[in-house]
Amino acid sequence: MDVDGRWRNLPSGPSLKHLTDPSYGIPPEQQKAALQDLTRAHVDSFNYAALEGLSHAVQAIPPFEFAFKDERISLTIVDAVISPPSVPKGTICKDLNVYPAECRGRKSTYRGRLTADISWAVNGVPKGIIKQFLGYVPIMVKSKLCNLYNLPPRVLIEHHEEAEEMGGYFIINGIEKVIRMLIVPRRNFPIAMVRPKWKSRGLGYTQFGVSMRCVREEHSAVNMNLHYVENGTVMLNFIYRKELFFLPLGFALKALVSFSDYQIFQELIKGKEEDSFFRNSVSQMLRIVIEEGCHSQKQVLNYLGECFRVKLSLPDWYPNVEAAEFLLNQCICIHLQSNTDKFYLLCLMTRKLFALARGECMDDNPDSLVNQEVLSPGQLFLMFLKEKMENWLVSIKIVLDKRAQKANVSINNENLMKIFSMGTELTRPFEYLLATGNLRSKTGLGFLQDSGLCVVADKLNFLRYLSHFRCVHRGAAFAKMRTTTVRRLLPESWGFLCPVHTPDGAPCGLLNHLTAVCEVVTKFVYTASIPALLCGLGVTPVDTAPCRPYSDCYPVLLDGVMVGWVDKDLAPEVADTLRRFKVLREKRIPPWMEVALIPMTGKPSLYPGLFLFTTPCRLVRPVQNLELGREELIGTMEQLFMNVAIFEDEVFGGISTHQELFPHSLLSVIANFIPFSDHNQSPRNMYQCQMGKQTMGFPLLTYQNRSDNKLYRLQTPQSPLVRPCMYDFYDMDNYPIGTNAIVAVISYTGYDMEDAMIVNKASWERGFAHGSVYKSEFIDLSEKFKQGEDNLVFGVKPGDPRVMQKLDDDGLPFIGAKLEYGDPYYSYLNLNTGEGFVVYYKSKENCVVDNIKVCSNDMGSGKFKCICITVRIPRNPTIGDKFASRHGQKGILSRLWPAEDMPFTESGMMPDILFNPHGFPSRMTIGMLIESMAGKSAALHGLCHDATPFIFSEENSALEYFGEMLKAAGYNFYGTERLYSGISGMELEADIFIGVVYYQRLRHMVSDKFQVRTTGARDKVTNQPLGGRNVQGGIRFGEMERDALLAHGTSFLLHDRLFNCSDRSVAHMCVECGSLLSPLLEKPPPSWSAMRNRKYNCTVCGRSDTIDTVSVPYVFRYFVAELAAMNIKVKLDVI
């Protein structure tokens, strides 16, 4: 993780030099580092999981032991390797390596082989190692296992990829999927909480508790809680295989160490020696253990093993002591290897719990970023992989038992190889997880949710694409909560989470985005040398008494390990020394280490101590260390106790220790693209962050190589004349999202009310905001096969009049051909019968065939059976299409106004857009007014203005700066001009504000949403029109529409809409008994004609003269029949 220099290359301001760059069109030597950093958290976490983490996970999987024919069989995974994606040897191909573009084009999965070495033993005697294929696992694009790793842009283009391909996603069935980063509690840190619902866990339980999420090196996690009970004792609870267990704390402490009761008592009361209540509580906890007859560590282990072994699923030959040790290893403080370290940590948690219950310290806010970290994609991948490997071992026993029931099976190398091949593969579980985002797990992996873990990395535009890699979600469980506390923006989030980049709907505050400078720690570092370094700085080891009383010392925790105690007067010096080592890269201190010293305040505040963190998945960000003059990565917890200045004049000597790298470091990547965002109302910046991701832009450059279901393309994009410096930092001109437009703020017609806007028809005819939609369809003839047949190929039957001059000889349309409704789309032949089949184009929208790809099978031996046809649908802006500026000012195109009727300036210039001035007062988007002046001056002087937020202030006014530039060009200081009416030619009385604004065309188009129906398909049961645009269904008519018609008194129109045009039917009814079901058509005598002289009779009354016809909705007849099935009779009165 490189700290120095990454943000030093930030452009001082935007420029137009790229327009005259002589190397345009030539791929650069290296990829843009800023873009690659956006997905670094995803890629690096997967690299660790697939390489180092996999070996740690294999070591953490305990041997699977079971009895078979009076023998003890042991299976152990000793090694596992994931191979880069490739096709099997013997495949017909030029290169065995598989590349992502091939998987996208064939709707297949980008995956590699997982091979493991399985060691087996009988009765404890090793018998050998078998190399076994466990299945395919998905590979993250641009990771070290990907075949694109470290390739330069030129080679990436040769493999049909983007020159700036960032990776960070998986390809599942041809679709790019991203594992979401989720907010989880900070690992290996005791969090004091107050939860009233804990009182319902048992008699005497209180709302006080201390929780810790213990995480191992291979990311396996177990949540562990200490509960305070009313009688002063403590209960320890943990979860094993989704089941909650409770254990008195005294049993856990005595099981971990062979200390005497007095030693345990002395350790627990450290710092509280004078607290008689606490001393009595500790004595009571130890007395509970003695009352169960457990006086020694071995007796306690035997007792715990006897109680828990039924839930641990261990072999019968395991003694109780080993079962208890298995429990301690898998459920209690699992991040620690030493039982002594676990003992000291539980003692610290107990002291913190009593301090919370006695009101001596505050509770920690679990919704604060201080007590949180992120769940990285590699972490989920590794946890899921480890569990599935454990399940594979269990499946081998099941297969072995089934085989033994049918035949006499002996355990040898050959038989085990056959049985191993019958175990459950890991291929389908992984593809299901990434394809659906649903987690199928017996343990739950310690998550609060089992759905929504993955999302599609759709390339609607480049902003939306890259935001997938910077978003963090609070969790699906919190979306259903009625409370708003989890959604609040807390001050602790400053610099880590963007305050404006969050949706304005249901996910508001739950779906957040990291700031541009925020990073996620992805590396593990071994900290074996740090405890000795701390002791050298004055920290007293945990098993040694300090010089001062414990109440005058801080506990020192390093990644959840109780290292020792430090004098409270010496602690600031120790923290500063560690910080200096971190910044200067000395003493092997990692640069992402977090040094948080929580001081004693004499008041109930956060629990004091010196907490050191080097673990991954934490959020860190760079700031300038004023004392050392270098950049430093700081974490969320240590930022609470720092004085970080923003501007130079806020730095006070002896108080300010750090300074922000730049004022806009609190904004996300997308929010940094908003020009003059500091001049806008905050909600407008939120809206732009969302609308910027809905813009019809230029998401990629390899349209000809993509097979996405739908892609958008703006045909006439432009580089904005007014843009922040971050726009150039990320080279966003390669993926533009809008057009510079001449905008006049004038209420010129009646068609611009309620945010509607007028567009110059001449500009529209010249291609203003013209776009296209690319749609791809896969046709696989193998899906059309009948049972046992393989005889269909694409082609045209010679002389077929249906496809003359429409399809090529291969049965496919010509490239560039225009398709209309009913035109031949493609044709295929049955080689056995010679019969030809023609499929016709069924879409109502005309299109152009853009490209056709021919696909094969995995072995390269497939016939001409699978193709992908991509069509291009031109989309000119039409009335009703949505547009927006970069300041959250959205509106629809209401009218294309003829150029001869548009107002014009003295120079004859006509605006492209007429914007209603009533859109400014309530929205307060002053940034749009400034952009209009800046864009106008930029066009006049041939410049590109810097719109980075916070560069202007009250002393350095933006109005003064851009007004003077307009004045220098001969225009009005305030950006207004005299306009002339296009209708009368008369000069307008008011000065009109006119300038250049960058406008975006959004993807919400009338062509995708309009719906018209006269007659069409109906539902078979209710006889009502079907819903849905794709099936030409009826238009939805809801309660609000009904109420509107009732309010206007148009009841007959309501009758026509909801009855005549819906499911009107004529039914026979008995007037006497009021039944719709009793009238039945009588059966005629054999001599009668079947169609003549037949009449309805009431089966209840036995009469036919009481039968009449009524018009009722068909769904009512269905409803009456359903009620009759429940013995409920419906009687109608006829008036």
Swiss-Prot record:
Instruction: Write out the transmembrane intervals.
Output: none
Q: Could you tell me what reaction this enzyme catalyses?
A: RNA(n) + a ribonucleoside 5'-triphosphate = RNA(n+1) + diphosphate
For binding DNA nontemplate strand, which residues are annotated in this chain's numbering?
1020
Region of interest called Loop B, as start-end residue ranges on this chain: 194-208
Please list the residues that bind Mg(2+).
755
List residues binding RNA.
Answer: 180, 367, 890
Q: Which GO terms describe its cellular component?
A: chromosome; cytosol; fibrillar center; mitochondrion; nucleolus; nucleoplasm; nucleus; RNA polymerase I complex
Q: Which stretches are annotated as coiled coil?
A: none
What cofactors does this protein use?
Mg(2+)
Locate the residues binding Zn(2+). Answer: 1070, 1073, 1098, 1101
Q: Which UniProt keywords apply?
A: Chromosome, DNA-directed RNA polymerase, Magnesium, Metal-binding, Nucleotidyltransferase, Nucleus, Phosphoprotein, Transcription, Transferase, Zinc, Zinc-finger
Manner of cofactor binding, per the entry note = Two Mg(2+) ions are coordinated by both the catalytic residues and the nucleic acid substrate to enhance substrate recognition and catalytic efficiency.
Quick one: where's region Disordered? 1-26
Describe the family membership recorded for this protein in Swiss-Prot or TrEMBL: Belongs to the RNA polymerase beta chain family.
Q: Tell me the subunit arrangement.
A: Component of the RNA polymerase I (Pol I) complex consisting of 13 subunits: a ten-subunit catalytic core composed of POLR1A/RPA1, POLR1B/RPA2, POLR1C/RPAC1, POLR1D/RPAC2, POLR1H/RPA12, POLR2E/RPABC1, POLR2F/RPABC2, POLR2H/RPABC3, POLR2K/RPABC4 and POLR2L/RPABC5; a mobile stalk subunit POLR1F/RPA43 protruding from the core and additional subunits homologous to general transcription factors POLR1E/RPA49 and POLR1G/RPA34. Part of Pol I pre-initiation complex (PIC), in which Pol I core assembles with RRN3 and promoter-bound UTBF and SL1/TIF-IB complex.
Q: What's the stated role of this polypeptide?
A: Catalytic core component of RNA polymerase I (Pol I), a DNA-dependent RNA polymerase which synthesizes ribosomal RNA precursors using the four ribonucleoside triphosphates as substrates. Transcribes 47S pre-rRNAs from multicopy rRNA gene clusters, giving rise to 5.8S, 18S and 28S ribosomal RNAs. Pol I-mediated transcription cycle proceeds through transcription initiation, transcription elongation and transcription termination stages.
Q: What is this protein called?
A: DNA-directed RNA polymerase I subunit RPA2
Taxonomic source organism? Mus musculus
Give the classification, highest ranks: Eukaryota, Metazoa, Chordata, Craniata, Vertebrata
Gene encoding it?
A: Polr1b
